Amino acid sequence: MKQKNYHSCTVGQIVAGNFDTTKVFSRYHIDFCCHGNTPFAEACRNRGIDPEAVAHELNELQENTVSNAPDFTGWPIDLLIDYVLKIHHRGIRAKGPQIEALLTKVTEAHSKNHPELLQVQALFRYSLLDLENHLSKEENVLFPYVYEMFQAKEEGLKVAKFHCGTILYPIEVMEDEHNHEGERFEKISSLTNGFTAPEDACASFRLVLQQLKQFEEALHEHIHLENNIIFPRALELEKKEAI
């Protein structure tokens, strides 16, 4: 199989082409969601990693793995938004409070020996509060207009201009909030040694760390889909509407 040249791509473009590549990027702590627009080689060098070594691993993954990941790049924008709403928005609202409740229980039991849990608990609580505000803005402001633009394009119609002139403004706000959440979960990961359970951890302690890791992984996919696929397509739709 022909080796791919990743040096002309951003990290986000590589992940958009094959979501399984996140396994490689995550292993090297290369941010593919919040900073997915970073050129591949630059992202590697920022982590002190040889781009050629990472490119070799990516090519090996492509050659030796049968991907079960959805080809999100082939989905229309309305389906992508449906997926984000039904999988990620619902997932945050369903799983977030459950994780918070278990984290509170674990913190009460283990914070004497593991005071870092108090910080983790506070960070996660504020994350859920900020995410709820973030999701509401997407659901009530940005996504309805993107749906409207997509439907108008399908039917050969025009839509009224966005109320604040361009969707670039809310998108920039969303991306800034994504960055903030990414940084917050980096702190949680650092405090928990990459969600690794200490030797004295009980079953609940181990479970909540596993759940926090899964929550972060889902958040990474969520942010990747929006920053690297949905938002650029929405801006392109708006540009075509203006012609």
Feature map (PLM): residue ranges:
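Small-residue-biased structural context
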Residues: 1-243
